[in-house]
Amino acid sequence: MDFEIQELNSDVLGKKLGQKLFSPKGSLLLGMGAEIKEFHYQKIKEVGYQSIYVLKDDYSDVLKSSGHLISEKLRASAPLELKGIYRKLMSKDKISISNGKKELSSMADTLIREVNIKMTNPPDIIDLKRQEDYLYQHAINVAAYSILIAQSVQYHQLKLFDVTLAALLCDFGMHYVDEEILYKPEPLDEKEIEEMRKHTILGFQYLGRNCFIKGLIAVVCLQHHERYDGSGYPKHMSGDDIHEYSRIVSIADFFDAYTSDRPYRRLHSIEEGIEYLKEPSGREFDPRIVRHFLSFFE
């Protein structure tokens, strides 16, 4: 790689930024390749980034790269838009829920159009996620990776649309998890882990009962942490008993989470994520779908 991940501290001063940084409202804070000065450092810190990408000495190829699955503009604006959609879906007002569903469908259409399956560079959508926006930024990335996989396995347009909606909603139930657990800066204890895991059931139940979301889409909320070898949750399902949509989204969800910076653990590189899926530990996932996903990094 032509960039490296560095914890946000004074050591980044004078280095070149390895990715565009945006404010919570989507405005550009600092462009890729810009030298990080004291003013920039303080602003980035104020916005809430915990680590950043810095370019290595020879960074000209990175600046010319076009391997992003989705545009910088959409990556900046979509999380805030999705946050608004979630709020509408959580409303008890039928009109707000209906509007939220329409906006969600529009977002799914936009993401599908943006993902370029014929790219010559490996897909690159790792983002520097602000803690308070992590859920929404993660959902956008999961959707983009899921689209990539779904296109690779030759999904027709309707199935592609469904799996995109499912990916955008897979962590909807996180809204019903205590924020102290959700944003805890250290590893969770066993009781907290059990509470966190309830998001699968809570999301499935709410979307089905209150939003009348299509059954197969809501099922992904329930199943996206199930594992092919039976080691997942909440029902310890295995193999083809797990719906294929869920098997696709589970890989996308894992890969983005694994390559994201979290308060309680360091960010892993794309290479480390790939190696995890290749090793025996990767047996948690459908091997056929894993092969489709990894083919984009070869």
Map each language-model feature to its residues.
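Acidic/His-rich, divalent-metal-binding segments that scaffold phosphate/diphosphate chemistry
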Residues: S60-R197, F204-C211, G215-L216
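Signal for well-folded cores of large energy- and translation-related assemblies
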Residues: K45, N116-T120, I147, G173, ...
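Short, contiguous strand/loop micro-motifs
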Residues: G26-L29, D133, E190, G232
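Terminal helices and disordered tails flanking the catalytic cores of nucleotide-processing hydrolases
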Residues: M1-A108, P122, R266-E298
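Alpha-helical scaffolding flanking metal-ion-dependent phosphate/phosphodiester catalytic sites
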Residues: L165-V177, L188, I193-Q205, R209-V290
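A short alpha-helix capping/helix-coil boundary motif
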Residues: G18-F22, D124-I126, L182-Y183, H225, ...
